[in-house]
C-alpha cells in the first residue's frame, strides 16, 4: 500500500508536468498577431500550435511503447528534458522556421508528458477512483488553459513574447526534481532511484558504442521493439496532410502539383502504416528476444468499438475546442483591438465551465460508475453550445453566456472518453498493464491529433475566408499580397469594430466557429455508439 506522502508527491509531480505541457499549448494563442507580423508570416502562424500538437500526437504511441520497455517514470523524466530543450529553442529563435522547429521538439517531449501522466495517475489508484484522478489532472490542464493565455498576454505586452517560452524552464526544472525523488510504484527500491541511475550512467562502458554489435542491437530494438517503420510512416503521412492544409491557398494554389502531392502521398503513407502494423506484423510471426513482435498500434486496440468510438469523439471535441478557444481570443484582439492580456481573459469563459464539468463527472463516476451518459451529454451540449457560439458579437454578457455549453462539453468529453477507453481493458487480463498503457496512449494520441488538426484547419479557414472576401470587395484600401500584411494594416488604421475591414475579419473568425459546430455534430454519431460499460465501484458505495 502506498504511503500518503508517496502518493501526494507523485500526484504533485504529475500535476506540475501536465500543467507544464498544457501551458505551452495555449500560451502561444495570444502571440499569433505579434509573431505573425514580426516574422511576416501569418499564413503559417497556425504552426505555432500545429507544430507542437502534430509531433505531440504522432509520438504519443511511441512513448507508450517506451514506457513498457524502460518504465513510466524514466520516460516521463526524459520527456520533461526534451520538452525543456524545445522551449529553449523557441525562446531563442530568430525566424519562423526556427520557432516552429522548437515547437516540434517541445511537442515531442509534451507527448510523453501528456500520455504518461495519465498512465501513472490512473494506475496508482483503484478503478473507481480513476475519475477523481483524471479530474485532478484535467483541472491542472484546464487551469493552464485559462492562465496560459493570460500569462502569455502579460509577457507579450510588458516583456517579450520570448518569455512565454522561458517561463517553461523553471517550472519544468521544479517538476523534474519532484518527479526524480517521488515514488511512482510504491516499491521500496525506488527510494534510491536517482542515485542508482546516476551511478549506472557513470559506470557504463562507453567503449560499447564503438562495437558493431551495439549498433546491430540498437537497430533491432528500433525496428522490432519500437516499431520505427510504423512511426516513420505515420508521422510522415500526418505531416504531409498538415503541410497540404497549411500551404494550400497560402504558399501554393490548391491545384498546384505540390499540394496535390501532399494530399496524395500523405494518405498513402497512412494506409501503408495501417497495412504494416495491422497486417504484416500481425501475420508475419516474427519474433525478437524470444517474444512475438508487437506493432506500435495493435489491431485489437484499434478495432475495439468502445475504444475507437470514444477516441474519435475525443478527437472531434479537441478539434472543436482548439478552434473556439484560439479564435475567441483572436476575435477580441483583431476585431475589438483588445490587448493580448485582456483578450486572453475571455478564455476563462470556456475554462471555468470545463473545470466544473470535470468535477461533476468525476463525482458521478465515482458514485455510480457511469460514463456513456456523460459523453452523450457532452456532445449534445457541444452541438447546442457551438451553435450559440457562432452568434458571439463581442458583448461581454453574450460572450460569457454562449461559452458555457461549449466549455461543459469539452470538460465532460475529455474526461469521460478516457474512462470509456480504459474500462475496455479488464483488470484480470494477464497483460493488463501493457494494454492499459496502450489504450491510454491511443486515446491521448487521438485528442492531440484533434488539437493539431484544429490549429491548422482554423488558420486555413481564417485565411481562405479573408482572402475570398477581400477579392470580391470594393474597399478603397491598398492591395495586399498576404493576410499578415492585411492584419498589420488593420492594426495601424483601426477605425472600430463596425468598419468594413473589421467586419471581414469578424466574418472569417465566425467561419472558423462554424467548423467547430460541424465537429460537434459529427461527434454525436460517434458518442451515441460508445460503450455502455461502467467503472467498478465498491460494495460500500453501492449500498
Curated annotation (Swiss-Prot):
It is found in: Membrane. GO terms for cellular component: endoplasmic reticulum; plasma membrane. Residues 30-41, 101-103, 153-162, 249-255, 322-341, 395-399, 465-508 are extracellular. GO terms for biological process: transmembrane transport. One of its GO terms (molecular function) is transmembrane transporter activity. The keyword Transport applies. The keyword Transmembrane applies. Residues 1-8, 63-79, 125-131, 184-227, 277-300, 363-373, 421-443, 530-543 are cytoplasmic. It holds the Pfam family MFS_1. The chain crosses the membrane at residues 9-29, 42-62, 80-100, 104-124, 132-152, 163-183, 228-248, 256-276, 301-321, 342-362, 374-394, 400-420, 444-464, 509-529. It is a multi-pass membrane protein. Keywords: Membrane, Transmembrane, Transmembrane helix, Transport. InterPro entries: MFS, MFS_dom, MFS_trans_sf. Drug export permease. Multi-copy suppressor of loss-of-function mutation of GAL11. Involved specifically in transcription of GAL4-dependent genes. Can link GAL4 with the basal transcription machinery if GAL11 is missing. Confers resistance to 10-N-nonyl acridine orange (NAO) and in general to cationic dyes. Belongs to the major facilitator superfamily. PANTHER family: AZOLE RESISTANCE PROTEIN 1-RELATED (PTHR23501:SF198), MAJOR FACILITATOR SUPERFAMILY (PTHR23501). This is Protein SGE1. It comes from Saccharomyces cerevisiae (strain ATCC 204508 / S288c) (Baker's yeast).
Amino acid at each position: 500500500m502506498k504511503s500518503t506522502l508517496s502518493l501526494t508527491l507523485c500526484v504533485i509531480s504529475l500535476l506540475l508536468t501536465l500543467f507544464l505541457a498544457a501551458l505551452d499549448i495555449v500560451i502561444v494563442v495570444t502571440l499569433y498577431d505579434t509573431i505573425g507580423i514580426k516574422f511576416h508570416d501569418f499564413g503559417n502562424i497556425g504552426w505555432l500550435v500545429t507544430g507542437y500538437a502534430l509531433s505531440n500526437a504522432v509520438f504519443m504511441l511511441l512513448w507508450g511503447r517506451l514506457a513498457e520497455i524502460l518504465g513510466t517514470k524514466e520516460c516521463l523524466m526524459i520527456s520533461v528534458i526534451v520538452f525543456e530543450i524545445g522551449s529553449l529553442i523557441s525562446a531563442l529563435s530568430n525566424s519562423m522556421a526556427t520557432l516552429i522547429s522548437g515547437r516540434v521538439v517541445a511537442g515531442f517531449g509534451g507527448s510523453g508528458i501528456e500520455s504518461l501522466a495519465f498512465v501513472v495517475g490512473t494506475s496508482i489508484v483503484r478503478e473507481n477512483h480513476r475519475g477523481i484522478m483524471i479530474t485532478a489532472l484535467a483541472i491542472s490542464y484546464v487551469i493552464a488553459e485559462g492562465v496560459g493565455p493570460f500569462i502569455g498576454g502579460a509577457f507579450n505586452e510588458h516583456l517579450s513574447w520570448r518569455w512565454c517560452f522561458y517561463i517553461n524552464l523553471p517550472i519544468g526544472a521544479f517538476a523534474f526534481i519532484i518527479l526524480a525523488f517521488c515514488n511512482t510504484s510504491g516499491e521500496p527500491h525506488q527510494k534510491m532511484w536517482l542515485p542508482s541511475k546516476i551511478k549506472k550512467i557513470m559506470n557504463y562502458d562507453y567503449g560499447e558504442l564503438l562495437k558493431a554489435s551495439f549498433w546491430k542491437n540498437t537497430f533491432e530494438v528500433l525496428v522490432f521493439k519500437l516499431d520505427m517503420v510504423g512511426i516513420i510512416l505515420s508521422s510522415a503521412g500526418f505531416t504531409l496532410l498538415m503541410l497540404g492544409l497549411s500551404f494550400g491557398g497560402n504558399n501554393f494554389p490548391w491545384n498546384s502539383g505540390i499540394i496535390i502531392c501532399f494530399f496524395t502521398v500523405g494518405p498513402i503513407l497512412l494506409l501503408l502504416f495501417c497495412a504494416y502494423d495491422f497486417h504484416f506484423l500481425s501475420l508475419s510471426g516474427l519474433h525478437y528476444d524470444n517474444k512475438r513482435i508487437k506493432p506500435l498500434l495493435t489491431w485489437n486496440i484499434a478495432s475495439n468499438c468502445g475504444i475507437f468510438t470514444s477516441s474519435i469523439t475525443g478527437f472531434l471535441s479537441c478539434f472543436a475546442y482548439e478552434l473556439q478557444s484560439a479564435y475567441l481570443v483572436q476575435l477580441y484582439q483583431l476585431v475589438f483591438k483588445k490587448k493580448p492580456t485582456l483578450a486572453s481573459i475571455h478564455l476563462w469563459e470556456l475554462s471555468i465551465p470545463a473545470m466544473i464539468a470535470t468535477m461533476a463527472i468525476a463525482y458521478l463516476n465515482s458514485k455510480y460508475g457511469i460514463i456513456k451518459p456523460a459523453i452523450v451529454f457532452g456532445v449534445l451540449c457541444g452541438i447546442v453550445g457551438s451553435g450559440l457560439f457562432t452568434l458571439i458579437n463581442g458583448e461581454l454578457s453574450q460572450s460569457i453566456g454562449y461559452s458555457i455549453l461549449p466549455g461543459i462539453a469539452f470538460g465532460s468529453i475529455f474526461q469521460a472518453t478516457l474512462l470509456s477507453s480504459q474500462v475496455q481493458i479488464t483488470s484480470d487480463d494477464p497483460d493488463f498493464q501493457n494494454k492499459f498503457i496502450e489504450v491510454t496512449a491511443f486515446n491521448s494520441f487521438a485528442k492531440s491529433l484533434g488539437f493539431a488538426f484544429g490549429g491548422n484547419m482554423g488558420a486555413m479557414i481564417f485565411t481562405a475566408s479573408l482572402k475570398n472576401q477581400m477579392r470580391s470587395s470594393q474597399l478603397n484600401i491598398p492591395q495586399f499580397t498576404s493576410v499578415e500584411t492585411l492584419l498589420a494594416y488593420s492594426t495601424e488604421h483601426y477605425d472600430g469594430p463596425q468598419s468594413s475591414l473589421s467586419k471581414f475579419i469578424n466574418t472569417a473568425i465566425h467561419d472558423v466557429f462554424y467548423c467547430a459546430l460541424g465537429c460537434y455534430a459529427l461527434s454525436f454519431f460517434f458518442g451515441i455508439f460508445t460503450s455502455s460499460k461502467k467503472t467498478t465501484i465498491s460494495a460500500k458505495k453501492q449500498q
